[in-house]
Amino acid sequence: MTETTRETEFVALGHAGSEHYAGLETFPNPGVEVVEMVSDELTAVCPITGQPDFYEATIEYRPQALCLESKSLKIYLSRFREQGAFCEALAVQIRDEVAEALRLDRSAVHVTLVQKPRGGITITASV
């Protein structure tokens, strides 16, 4: 387990100051087959112009032993606020880090980012 993931000993959930911890926390799967988490609070900046990009993120996975804790996901997604990233690269990074936290093969995690229109163009990247 990396330093950006935790299992069961929650840091983010119910603790003041937890917004400084940007890791993904997990808990034992209670028996669900598919989990879908959707957030419209993901932001990053264009690595070229520095302009803000706003996203709707959908993360779907088929859990085995572990599930993602939602507050830790919210805080994790907020860490990208100041990061320069293209939509496509961000989708891959999130997929890979979620898969690692859940101890799943990357093929068991699907991430779709819909970048809100800027310049009249909407971008959707899925992995």
Annotate each language-model stretch with its function.
Residues 1-127:
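N-terminal intrinsically disordered, cationic/polar leader segments
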